[in-house]
Amino acid sequence: MAENKRVISIENRIPELKKYRKKKLVRHLAILIGIFVILIAITLYFLSPLSKLDKIAVSGNKQLTENEVRKESGLEIGEFVIGISNGKTEDALKKNTLIKDATVSKEGLNDVQINITEFKTIGYQQQDGKYYDVLESGIMLTDQPRQFPIGNDLLFQNFKNGKTLEKMVDQINKLPKDVVSSISEVIYSPTKSDKNHIKLYMNDGNQVSADISTFAEKMQHYPAIVAQLAKGQKGVIDIEVGSYFQSYYQQNAEKKATEEAAKEKKETNE
């Protein structure tokens, strides 16, 4: 009897086993079909124009042309969109001395938008009859000379790309706008005792003698210093150590007295 019951039990389970195997087979087939469909979709995507970069839009550029920005980005029309890294493209753009900041974003399925912020031109270096942009970053564009300066920005003289120019621009950037707009020219004129000496010609007719390292700290008081001068009085304001004013009249008188003394001494020796 026990053996008969066992045979009957196995026979009853056979349909269930077949049903389980069928479900398992269907599940495996579904997985395989799904993988196959995904592979086909991926293949079709990479074969379609949608997978490739179609358009590179540029905004925020003023000095750089759109084509120059595209070239700096390293992106090329027709390359696979999936391989484009926004971060790496932004880093590539920021290597350009004119670009202060850059953001890259994907638009739609296969377009890229590039937005840049350029360093502003704060003045021009006057050299050999040409003018070279001096940027707010402290860099001078030596490969892009102009015939004439644009607007009423500062004029620089005797500067070269390097730490001295960077320090000078950094000091200027710290000044209030009204003080900067009162400056006409900044001339680098180092002496034996002061390698950071500069001379400024002001729009109001005065001159300023200063040191680059303390320029912003002391030059911010220029309006107050000028306000204390007699009306119409012009001269040289020395802010290297403290603050000292010498009128052009005094300066010329001292120069004349020195020349006369030298002349008398020469005549006496003869």
Curated annotation (Swiss-Prot):
Compartment annotation: Cell membrane
Cited Pfam families: FtsQ_DivIB_C, POTRA_1
Membrane topology according to the record: Single-pass type II membrane protein
Ranges in the topological domain labelled Extracellular: 50-270
Residues exposed to the Cytoplasmic side: 1-28
GO biological process, one term: FtsZ-dependent cytokinesis
Family listed: Belongs to the FtsQ/DivIB family. DivIB subfamily.
Function text: Cell division protein that may be involved in stabilizing or promoting the assembly of the division complex.
Protein name (Swiss-Prot/TrEMBL): Cell division protein DivIB
Natural source organism: Listeria monocytogenes serovar 1/2a (strain ATCC BAA-679 / EGD-e)
Upper taxonomic lineage: Bacteria, Bacillati, Bacillota, Bacilli, Bacillales
Gene that specifies this protein: divIB
